């Protein structure tokens, strides 16, 4: 298996650094005692510090491969695989990983023409969906940070305040964390669509000021040791709008109904049916999913890209699924 998703690399080895913008991966072979971390030379020190791997399982490629096309780090990876005599076997790759580029795959196909490549279908992501008790504690720490930062958001988002100033305070709260748990950078920027922007879920802050009577969506995540626990809330500034208030009440009722179905043995679809059953009762339409699996995250996403709380998702909920 060649795993290029930085969250999977972290899960498999403990590796944690802002180096995912260029080629890196973890190799997993059934006959090897440990995974192998493949990184650029400049970042290998991070693997010595952050991972549990023996030095021999940290392989670094020379800096001459950085942004010097047609040369590419995966050419070096091909030679590593050949040296280990793994060039005539089935190899799984993460075809839809954000950081597994077309060039990465092309170099593998060209350099390892005796191997057969197969989509791993998010194998590691699906393993990550069920957390250990220790991971749950990290998720709970992230949740406490989210709660604190959301309270900060409620305090600082007011008519006349610039959006960017509010985000500065929110970010400070997220990084400060709590006395027990320090914060970390999130995989997604603070999302703050306001006014007409609430029709587009993923807008970030501008220098514009908040306006009395408008709604603002706040989507943030506390992060502790790369584990995320996102939270989203909507606030109305000043002047009441009964339609928005009624919609919020119905949405909260739908959330409570969905949460009541979050039990081991139920499916994600069971939760979704309870949620949308309430929305349907009030004539409210929502086309997008209402939840997804979370855990370790790196930009550009804190979702695990597996379970969705949406109609038709038959994933069975288990203890410690987050």
Task: Please provide the spans of the model-predicted regions.
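Active-site neighborhoods and metal-handling regions in enzymes and metal-associated proteins
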Residues: 1-322
């Amino acid at each position: 298996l060649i795993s290029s998703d930085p969250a999977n690399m972290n899960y498999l080895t403990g590796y944690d650094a802002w180096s995912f913008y260029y080629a890196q991966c973890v190799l997993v072979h059934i006959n090897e005692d440990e995974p192998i971390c493949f990184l650029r030379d400049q970042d290998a020190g991070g693997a010595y510090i952050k991972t549990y791997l023996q030095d021999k399982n940290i392989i670094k490629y020379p800096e001459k491969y950085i942004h010097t096309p047609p040369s590419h780090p995966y050419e070096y990876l091909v030679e590593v695989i050949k040296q280990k005599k793994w060039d005539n076997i089935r190899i799984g790759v993460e075809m839809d990983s954000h950081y597994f580029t077309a060039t990465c795959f092309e170099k593998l196909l060209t350099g390892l023409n005796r191997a057969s490549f197969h989509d791993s279908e998010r194998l590691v992501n699906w393993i990550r969906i069920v957390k250990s008790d220790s991971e749950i504690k990290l998720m709970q720490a992230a949740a406490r940070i989210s709660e604190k930062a959301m309270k900060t958001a409620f305090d600082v988002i007011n008519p006349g305040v610039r959006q960017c100033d509010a985000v500065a305070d929110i970010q400070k709260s997220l990084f400060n964390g709590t006395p027990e748990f320090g914060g970390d950078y999130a995989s997604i920027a603070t999302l703050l669509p306001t006014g007409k922007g609430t029709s587009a879920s993923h807008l970030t802050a501008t220098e514009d000021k908040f306006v009395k009577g408008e709604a603002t969506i706040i989507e943030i995540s506390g992060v502790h040791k790369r584990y995320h626990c996102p939270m989203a809330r909507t606030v109305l500034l000043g002047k009441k709008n009964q339609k928005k208030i009624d919609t919020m009440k119905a949405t909260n009722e739908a959330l409570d109904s969905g949460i009541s179905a979050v039990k081991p043995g139920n499916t994600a679809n069971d939760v979704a049916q309870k949620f949308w059953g309430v929305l349907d009762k009030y004539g409210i339409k929502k086309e997008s999913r209402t939840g997804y699996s979370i855990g370790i995250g790196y930009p550009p996403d804190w979702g695990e890209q597996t379970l969705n709380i949406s109609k038709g998702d038959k994933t069975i909920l288990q203890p410690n699924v987050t």
